[in-house]
Amino acid sequence: MKWLVESVINHLNTVLPSNIVYAPIKANVLDVGTNNEPRKSIALRIIPAAPGQQYFEGETIRKQFQILVKSPNGLEAMSSIEAIADELHNLHMHSFHSIDDSYNLITLEKYVEPNWVDKTEANEQIYTALFSVELEIGGN
């Protein structure tokens, strides 16, 4: 869902400092580094989710997404994913900087805590966290 990806990226770029969002946030994939040139990278990808609830006057949309961060400095990657997860968890209770009002954010919650994923051949550390979102079409 393009709106969700662009809105979350916009929100994170608006509220978090550059030492947390230390690379451009891309959709779906992390940049690939080499042994001679490791690369810092942040990615957001939509992952499978159950359908939303049906209501008398419409329905909600449920989406889940994963944020991955990668850096040759493991502490930098860990600090970044923890700050991103803290910012996004229960975001529906705060101000959400979406790209437009096509959807109304009902809930946005972290459902898997930040954790280590892997170390690449270029000695980059990858961390991730998973989030669940419920949206209503035609926000306010």
Regions found by a protein language model. Give the residues of each.
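Oligomerization/assembly interface segments of phage tail-like spikes and tubes
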Residues: 59-75, 125-137
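Small/polar-rich, solvent-exposed N-terminal microdomains that initiate assembly or binding
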Residues: 1-57, 91-97
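A generic structural signal for short, non-catalytic loop/turn and secondary-structure boundary residues
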Residues: 35-37, 60, 101, 124
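Mid-chain, well-packed structural core segment of small domains
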Residues: 72-93
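Hydrophobic beta-strand residues in large extracellular and virion-surface proteins
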Residues: 8, 12, 42-44, 67, ...
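Short acidic, gly/pro-rich beta-turn/loop elements at beta-sheet edges
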Residues: 54, 77, 139-140
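Acidic-leaning, charged glycine-interspersed low-complexity segments
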Residues: 89-134, 138
